[in-house]
Design a protein with these regions (language model features):
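Acidic catalytic patch
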Residues: 43-44, 62-85
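Hydrophobic/aromatic ligand-binding patch that stacks against planar heteroaromatic rings
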Residues: 31, 97, 115
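PIN/NYN-family metal-dependent endoribonuclease catalytic core
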Residues: 8-9, 19, 24-54
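Acidic, PIN/NYN-like endoribonuclease modules and their adjacent C-terminal/linker elements
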Residues: 84-88, 92, 110-145
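A secondary-structure boundary/capping signal
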Residues: 10-11, 42, 108-109, 125
C-alpha cells in the first residue's frame, strides 16, 4: 500500500504559502491539508513556526495551525547539534526532525538547500517536491521511527 509522502516543512515555506496561496508553497500546504502529503512536526519546530508567523502581519497562524495534527507529532527527542553544517541554529531543528523520521525536508532556505549531502537528508524546494511524481512511483513514504 502506498502512503502519502512524509515531509517536514520549514517555516519559510509556511510564510510563503500564507502570502500566496497560489504559489508552490501554497500548493504544497494544500496537499498536506487534503492528506496527499503527510507533514511531521515536533514541538520545537511548531513553536518556531508559530513565533515567526505571528510576528508577520497580515498573515495569520490560524490559517495553518490545523496542519499540526497530533497524530503526526514526533514526540521523541531530536538532536539539532548534529547538524552544525547549517549556520542557523533554528534551521538545525528542521534538519534534525527530517533525519529522525526519514522525511523529506521542504525549504526555501539556501543554507539547507546547499548542503543536503552533509546533512544526510533530502532537501527540496516546494516546486521540486511538487514536480516529483511521488504518487506514481514505487516510493511509499517513510513510517515514523
Amino acid at each position: 500500500m502506498r502512503h502519502p509522502p512524509t515531509i517536514v516543512i520549514d517555516t519559510n515555506v509556511f510564510v510563503a504559502a500564507l502570502f500566496r496561496k497560489d504559489s508552490h508553497a501554497g500548493r504544497l500546504v494544500e496537499h498536506v491539508r487534503r492528506g496527499r502529503t503527510r507533514m511531521i512536526w515536533h514541538r520545537e519546530t511548531k513553536q518556531e513556526t508559530r513565533a515567526i508567523v505571528e510576528r508577520i502581519p497580515p498573515i495569520d497562524w490560524a490559517d495553518v495551525c490545523d496542519l499540526f495534527q497530533k497524530e503526526n507529532e514526533f514526540d521523541s527527542p531530536i538532536d539539532p547539534t548534529r547538524f552544525d553544517a547549517v549556520p542557523d541554529p533554528d534551521d538545525r531543528r528542521f534538519a534534525a526532525l527530517a533525519h529522525a523520521v526519514g522525511a523529506v525536508l521542504v525549504s526555501q532556505d539556501d543554507d539547507l538547500l546547499g548542503c543536503p549531502e552533509r546533512l544526510n537528508i533530502l532537501v527540496l524546494t516546494p516546486k521540486e517536491f511538487l514536480e516529483r511524481d511521488w504518487w506514481a512511483s514505487e516510493w511509499s513514504g517513510t513510517p515514523i521511527r
